[in-house]
Amino acid sequence: MFSGIIEEVGTVESYDGETLVVRANQVLDDLEISESIMVAGACLTVTELSETDSTFTVETVPETRNRTNFGALEQGSKVNLERSLRYGDRVGGHIVQGHVDGVGTVRSVVEDGNSRVIVIEAPANIIESVVEKGFITVDGTSLTVVDRNKDSFSIAIIPYTFDHTTLNERPEGSKVNLEADVTAKYVANLIEPYIGKLQK
């Protein structure tokens, strides 16, 4: 479990479609093999650590590759990183599972005062769980939804978040990993069997 507060932006050292090696600094502190780490919004298991190279290694499976933008990763790509929460940790964002629901496309990035408003086009299965002023996870970052349309939603990014995440490298047309708020997904799943009955 994570909170969507990015600790560090790491750099991809190598990725062959299965084994992903990431160079980092801060998140390596007390990180252990077999622990979970969120990479660009996806919860992955650490399989190797290298103190000499300041890298960690994770493995991706077909389900991860099909659900994420990992197909575009290459040496030098930047990725948001967050270690898993421990009991007693402060949850600065919201409850994030690290289970990416799908990939969205940045439709526009517009400066608005000291913020940037980003509009993201998203698949229907994600849009139906997006709530205005609710939470959404974009490439692992916990963000608040400004508004929602039938096929897109917008988020407002403060300067600190823009400067300390990969959102500053996501121009129009970029693909981003999305995870809808888990609470919304559970509620939708619980009431779905009864919707048809209520409509009769």
List PLM regions with ranges.
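Conserved loop->alpha-helix
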Residues: 1-200
